[in-house]
């Protein structure tokens, strides 16, 4: 009997140990992902490719960062709370299948027990430690604390004596026990919370026992009811645990001891087949044995299921208090909840499989949270790279056009203003004349009321010296000139207001955008541009702020009055004298000469401003040229270095998450083989039945990067009826043994065949055209996302069971901004501009035209023009020279042939948009259906056409 129990103990220990060991292996992969991610992000932050506010977002959120730190740094631990000391001791003894905790009777529950920390050690040993990890050395030599030879942990080492119960240090001390046990050897730790310790609350015990570990919470009970104190403790525990689930373990003895004894014998017999050599067998064998044992456990549970009135109190109490769902719902939910919805549950102590399952799911919960957080960070970085690449490409394309636009608009403004000054001189003279006539009386009145400054004038208005008379005259002149200047210039501004509004607004916005791009460098060029605009074109501001334009008018008008001879010294400088001086000045104005002078000065100033503007714009263009070269270098580095590295990390993080959630897919028969991988069938994975698994073994970093980028673009595309959906991915690190590259398994929805096979199987023309319409719709969807497929061909179009087409193999698919001009694709489908390295999404239109040729031809033979080419180079040369597939009669009607020719036009600008292609192809498809119906080929044409219209809508 003892040998049977020992064998059963090892089997259960290995089962839980296997889960913990598996968790450790997955954690090791997670640590590598985090390490590589930190290195990559550190390099990004020091690269000066992104602004500070963008760099600040490349971090994990605080909550996610905390959980990632816990999972990667702390070992997993079972933290056992309980209703009584005996229930906790029973659970620990059940886990280890030996009496580590000695139980005398129920009186043990009234005693004070300190916390116990079980972890791995080469020898069995115990010691007392404080929270700060210092060992208590004040025990007597030879005391039980120093013993290292025991079967069960001595009670005296866990029991707090009465004389020590008022000693806070002794109460808070922890009994640390080391065991050489397979379960603890996997770095699992077990912590048992203190019992009946005065002054130590549940929250304090929780904080101490969960410190520096990754907790899995268990609460055991062995009484028929929970006391009010138990319920308060549970509520406090729930508040401390937050979102962490709690497993309630029923440690009560079975109601039928004899039946329980027979059931234990049956379980022991079932587990006895294990021996020491099979402790870490293959996953398949372990999983098979586990399923067999779970089946046995299920049968046993059915046999010992209690009656409805048999001890339901505790579960009802837990349900009413909200700690668990109702007993019926708890039974239905058990075993079917996914990891994201793991909840509190109740299990029987003897249902070890369910307990192990809860522990496994709790550990998975930690891993999934970490993997999800890391994957979200990787996705954020990838989206940032793509957005940045688009911004950089736009900057490279738009900046030269902005500079050219600014130059063109400035020239137009210069020519318009120059013509204005040449044509408006007579109007300007009339403007000055009318202005003077309108304001003469007002000027005379203001002159008569003027009070001289800095002059000594007697009360009678007498002036004694000729010098003072001259100064009085000058002040009257200044007054009249100032008023005259303001009115003349105000009307002068109105004559060029239309030009100012027509040219300056757009020109200023264009220059402002150029200066904003160069805003970090406050150079003389930027300042000069602003000064030129203010001085040359913003006439209103310059005049009103006493700029040089005002000074020009001021000085010229002063010259006209210099010839006025001073009056004889009057006896009185009164109002009449002031008005007379002002009237004399107005009478001596020469409007023609003044208008000519103003126009001449304005032309001179305009020419100088134009030359200065052109020089400054050339300097700005040179600066932007250097900056754009640096921008192109940054774009290439983002595309070639940072994006592939982060895409690979994103692939690894999501693959690890899928591995934790759904496990390794079981590969069945081979259903396809391509250049880069093999495709297998898979019965079910991740809740999806009938999957296809594409197994790829990247031989080097370049292939790894290409695969990662393909997966990123495929996975980031929203679900669409015309794109083959990717379900998930798993990385098999054990593929090929040590030192070999791991295999990447991409799981996709299972399709029936490809278009190449369908055409060989003599698919009818209307159905082939229907598939071509599906392809056009799928490519249009990719283009709407800014993606270019670059490899549209027959074998990359898969058909479902209804012969509807879906595009697959996005290995060459990229956003336009992320393309480097590399030559990719299938030679016969490659547009001529692909060989130059400068192309856009119209290459997909070209490839679609070639695909349409095969669709209408009804066979998969090479076009005769291409069949004569000896090799790829010969084929590419012919394509660049304009060689295209020939027209087949009578297969091609005029509409289909013209659509093909326009699609594969040599100039990308001459190719139609895919929306236009789809519209014309719809007409061709409708005619094909009508023709088949007219020939008696079937009555389903109208129905198919109606279905297609519905799909299109």
Curated annotation (Swiss-Prot):
UniProt cross-references to InterPro entries, sorted A to Z: Dual_SerThr-Tyr_Kinase, Kinase-like_dom_sf, Prot_kinase_dom, Protein_kinase_ATP_BS, Ser/Thr_kinase_AS
Swiss-Prot/TrEMBL GO biological process terms: cellular response to fibroblast growth factor stimulus; embryonic organ development; negative regulation of apoptotic process; positive regulation of ERK1 and ERK2 cascade; positive regulation of fibroblast growth factor receptor signaling pathway
Pfam families, per the entry: Pkinase
Keyword Protein biosynthesis: no
Limits of the Protein kinase domain: 665-926
Molecular-function GO terms, alphabetical: ATP binding; protein serine kinase activity; protein serine/threonine kinase activity; protein serine/threonine/tyrosine kinase activity; protein tyrosine kinase activity
This enzyme's EC code(s): 2.7.12.1
Sequence positions that bind ATP: 671-679, 694
Catalytic activity, reaction form: L-seryl-[protein] + ATP = O-phospho-L-seryl-[protein] + ADP + H(+); L-threonyl-[protein] + ATP = O-phospho-L-threonyl-[protein] + ADP + H(+); L-tyrosyl-[protein] + ATP = O-phospho-L-tyrosyl-[protein] + ADP + H(+)
Annotated disulfide bonds: none
Class of the enzyme per the UniProt entry, highest EC level: transferase
GO cellular component terms listed in the entry, alphabetical order: anchoring junction; apical plasma membrane; basolateral plasma membrane; cytoplasm
Signal peptide: none
Location of this chain's protein in the cell: Cytoplasm; Cell membrane; Apical cell membrane; Basolateral cell membrane
Region (Disordered): 932-953
Active-site residue list: 791 (proton acceptor)
Record's keyword terms, sorted: ATP-binding, Cell junction, Cell membrane, Cytoplasm, Developmental protein, Kinase, Membrane, Nucleotide-binding, Serine/threonine-protein kinase, Transferase, Tyrosine-protein kinase
Family recorded in the similarity comment: Belongs to the protein kinase superfamily. Ser/Thr protein kinase family.
Role noted for this protein: May act as a positive regulator of ERK phosphorylation downstream of fibroblast growth factor-receptor activation. May induce both caspase-dependent apoptosis and caspase-independent cell death. May play a role in the embryonic development.
The protein, known as: Dual serine/threonine and tyrosine protein kinase
Taxonomic lineage: Eukaryota, Metazoa, Echinodermata, Eleutherozoa, Echinozoa
């Amino acid at each position: 009997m003892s040998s049977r129990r020992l064998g059963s103990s090892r089997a259960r220990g290995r089962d839980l140990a296997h889960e913990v060991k598996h968790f450790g292996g997955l954690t090791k992969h997670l640590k590598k992902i985090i390490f590589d991610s930190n290195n990559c992000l550190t390099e990004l932050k020091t690269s000066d490719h992104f602004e500070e506010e963008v760099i600040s977002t490349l971090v994990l959120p605080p909550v996610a960062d905390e959980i990632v730190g816990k999972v990667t740094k702390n070992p997993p631990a079972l933290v056992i709370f309980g209703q009584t000391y005996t229930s906790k001791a029973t659970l620990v003894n059940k886990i280890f299948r030996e009496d580590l905790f000695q139980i005398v009777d129920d009186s043990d529950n009234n005693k004070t027990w300190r916390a116990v920390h079980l972890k791995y050690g080469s020898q069995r040993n115990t010691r007392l430690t404080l929270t700060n990890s210092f060992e208590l050395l004040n025990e007597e030599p030879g005391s039980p604390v120093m013993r290292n030879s025991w079967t069960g942990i001595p009670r005296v080492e866990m029991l707090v004596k009465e004389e020590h119960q008022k000693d806070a240090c002794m109460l808070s001390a922890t009994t640390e026990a080391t065991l050489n046990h397979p379960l603890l050897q996997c770095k699992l730790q077990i912590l048992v919370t203190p019992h009946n310790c005065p002054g130590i609350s549940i929250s304090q015990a929780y904080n101490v026992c969960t410190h520096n570990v990754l907790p899995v919470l268990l609460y055991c009970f062995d009484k028929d009811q929970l006391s009010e104190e138990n319920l308060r403790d549970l509520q406090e525990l729930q508040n401390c645990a937050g979102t962490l689930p709690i497993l309630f373990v029923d440690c009560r003895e079975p109601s039928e001891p004899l039946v329980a004894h027979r059931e234990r014998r049956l379980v022991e017999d079932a587990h006895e087949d294990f021996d020491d050599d099979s402790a870490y067998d293959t996953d398949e064998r372990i999983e098979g044995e586990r399923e067999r044992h779970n089946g046995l456990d299920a049968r046993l549970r059915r046999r010992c299921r209690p009656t409805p009135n048999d001890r339901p109190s505790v579960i009802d109490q837990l349900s009413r208090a909200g700690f668990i769902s109702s007993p019926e719902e708890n039974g239905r939910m058990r075993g079917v909840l996914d990891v994201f919805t793991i909840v509190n549950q109740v299990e029987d102590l003897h249902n070890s499989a369910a307990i192990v399952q809860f522990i496994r799911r709790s550990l998975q919960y930690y891993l999934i949270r970490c993997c999800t957080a890391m994957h979200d960070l990787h996705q954020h970085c990838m989206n940032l790279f793509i957005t940045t690449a688009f911004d950089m490409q736009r900057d490279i394309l738009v900046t030269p056009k902005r500079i050219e636009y600014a130059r063109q608009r400035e020239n137009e403004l210069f020519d318009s203003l120059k013509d204005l000054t040449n044509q408006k001189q007579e109007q300007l003279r009339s403007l000055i004349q009318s202005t003077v006539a309108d304001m003469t009386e007002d000027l005379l009145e203001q002159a008569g009321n003027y009070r001289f400054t800095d002059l000594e004038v007697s009360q009678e208005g007498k002036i004694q010296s000729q010098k003072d008379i001259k100064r009085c005259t000058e002040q009257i002149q200044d007054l009249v000139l100032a008023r005259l200047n303001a009115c003349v210039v105000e009307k002068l501004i109105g004559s060029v207001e239309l030009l100012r509004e027509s040219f300056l607004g757009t020109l200023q916005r264009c220059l402002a955008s150029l200066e904003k791009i160069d805003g970090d460098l406050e150079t003389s060029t930027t300042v000069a541009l602003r000064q030129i605009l203010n001085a040359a074109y913003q006439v209103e501001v310059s005049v009103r702020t006493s700029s040089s334009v005002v000074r020009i008018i001021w000085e010229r008008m002063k010259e006209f009055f210099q010839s006025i001879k001073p009056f004889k010294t009057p006896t009185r400088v009164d109002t009449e004298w002031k008005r007379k001086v002002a009237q004399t000045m107005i009478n001596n104005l020469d409007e023609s000469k003044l208008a000519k002078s103003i126009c001449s000065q304005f032309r001179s100033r305009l020419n100088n401003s134009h030359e200065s503007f052109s020089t400054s714009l050339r300097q700005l263009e040179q600066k932007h040229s250097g900056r754009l070269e640096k921008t192109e270098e940054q774009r290439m580095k983002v595309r070639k270095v940072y994006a592939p590295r982060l895409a690979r990390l994103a692939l690894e993080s999501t693959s690890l998450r899928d591995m934790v959630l759904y496990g390794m897919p079981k590969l069945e028969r081979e259903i396809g083989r391509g250049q880069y991988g093999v495709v297998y069938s898979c019965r079910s994975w991740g809740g999806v039945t009938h999957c296809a698994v594409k197994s790829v073994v990247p031989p080097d970093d370049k292939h790894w990067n290409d695969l990662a980028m393909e997966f990123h673009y495929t996975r980031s595309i929203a679900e669409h009826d015309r794109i083959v959906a990717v379900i998930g991915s798993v990385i098999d690190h054990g593929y090929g043994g040590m030192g070999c590259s791991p295999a990447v398994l991409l799981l996709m929805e299972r399709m029936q065949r490809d278009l190449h096979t369908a055409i060989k199987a003599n698919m009818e023309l209307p159905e082939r055209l229907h598939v071509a319409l599906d392809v056009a719709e799928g490519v249009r969807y990719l283009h709407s996302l800014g993606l270019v497929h670059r490899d549209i061909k027959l074998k990359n179009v898969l058909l479902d069971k209804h012969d509807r087409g879906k595009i697959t193999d996005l290995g060459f698919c990229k956003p336009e901004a992320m393309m480097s001009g590399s030559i990719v694709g299938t030679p016969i489908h490659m547009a001529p501009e692909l060989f130059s390295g400068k192309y856009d999404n119209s290459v997909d239109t070209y490839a679609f035209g070639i695909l349409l040729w095969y669709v209408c031809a009804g066979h998969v033979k090479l076009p005769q023009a291409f069949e004569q080419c000896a090799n790829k180079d010969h084929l590419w040369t012919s394509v660049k020279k304009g060689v295209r597939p020939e027209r087949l009669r009578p297969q091609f009607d005029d509409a289909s042939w013209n659509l093909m020719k326009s699609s594969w036009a040599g100039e990308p600008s001459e190719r139609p948009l895919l929306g236009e292609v789809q519209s014309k192809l719809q007409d061709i498809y409708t005619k094909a259906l009508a023709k088949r119906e007219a020939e008696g080929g079937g009555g389903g044409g109208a129905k198919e056409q109606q279905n297609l219209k519905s799909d299109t809508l």
